[in-house]
Amino acid sequence: MLILVSPAKTLDFEQPPLTQIHTRPDFLAQSQELIQVCQQLTPSDIATLMKVSDSIAGLNAARFGEWKPDYSIDNAKQAIFAFRGDVYTGFDADTLTAAQLERTQSQLRILSGLYGLLRPLDLILPYRLEMGTALTNQKGKNLYEFWGNTLTDAVNSAVAAQGDGIIINLASNEYFKAIKPKFLNGQLITPVFKDFKNGQYKVISFFAKRARGMMARYIIDQQVSSIDGLKAFEVDGYYYSEELSKPNEPTFLREAQ
């Protein structure tokens, strides 16, 4: 069972990681191509392109300028410990045991605009480059065209290594658009999380992001290996709804918070 998640805009490079064990991203050559494009952008360009404040644009212009492919554990951090935000709050990587971290490294993949597809222990430098960014590059007019079939092929390789052919999509639409589902060699399952509000169950972004992280952690903790095992997810008030579920979209509900 392979789990796909999105990265986070919020980063933590201050707190030391739980382990010094690390790996190198598979697509650093492509990352460097993108960095070289980004290094040509002024802070004003970045503010317009990414729709961010001048201060955030300036920070990321500096990050692009300082980025080098030969970074190490001394000035970088493993992705699973560097990313913060709602999904990662739900996943709570800081409480993983060594055995759980090993399973996470095997089963979890993080889609990234800059790095393509990350394993949890892959080292990253601070960056901001969302997958939906319309960054013109030598391969096209955006990052979806830049990555092409590369990430789909990488996911296929990773799911083949798992052996059961199940892909759990816990990524956002923006990031999963970098994958081409019709070329995936496996059963694609996209869980849906709905909270009760104003008289109906609906997807509430903040809660859904956290729930995706909690489900990813549940799969690791419980060593879930089947769709039926996934349906047993009952964390933080969520429960499986057979009535609202579709064959490849198991739906989980939660009452008003």
UniProtKB/Swiss-Prot annotation:
Belongs to the UPF0246 family. This is UPF0246 protein SO_3540. Pfam families: H2O2_YaaD. GO terms for biological process: response to hydroperoxide. InterPro entries: YaaA. GO terms for cellular component: cytosol.
